[in-house]
């Protein structure tokens, strides 16, 4: 997807809030926008 590994890491190493879909830091425990605690890692593989 990205042209070089640093860019790909920057795009994919995030967590997504299950409540508001905000992008959060990989080390986050709560969402920065809504405070929700249920965060999932961003999917690394693209869907077919």
From Swiss-Prot:
Please list every transmembrane segment annotated in the UniProt record, as residue ranges: none
Superkingdom: Archaea
**InterPro entries in the record, alphabetically?**
Ribosomal_eL40_arc (IPR023657), Ribosomal_eL40_dom (IPR001975), Ribosomal_eL40_sf (IPR038587), Ribosomal_zn-bd (IPR011332)
Q: Which UniProt keywords apply?
A: Ribonucleoprotein, Ribosomal protein
Report the GO terms under cellular component: ribonucleoprotein complex; ribosome
Q: Name one GO molecular function term.
A: structural constituent of ribosome
Q: Which SUPFAM superfamilies match?
A: Zn-binding ribosomal proteins
Q: One of this protein's GO BP terms?
A: translation
Q: Name one Pfam family in it.
A: Ribosomal_L40e
Looking up HAMAP family in the UniProt record yields: Ribosomal_eL40 (MF_00788)
**Family under the similarity heading:** Belongs to the eukaryotic ribosomal protein eL40 family.
- What name appears for this protein in its UniProt entry? Large ribosomal subunit protein eL40
Q: Which organism is it from?
A: Methanoregula boonei (strain DSM 21154 / JCM 14090 / 6A8)
Identify the gene encoding this protein.
Answer: rpl40e
């Amino acid at each position: 997807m990205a042209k070089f590994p640093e860019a790909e890491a920057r795009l994919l190493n995030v967590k997504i809030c299950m409540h508001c879909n905000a992008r959060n830091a990989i080390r986050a425990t709560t969402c920065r926008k809504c405070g929700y605690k249920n965060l999932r890692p961003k999917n690394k593989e693209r869907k077919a």
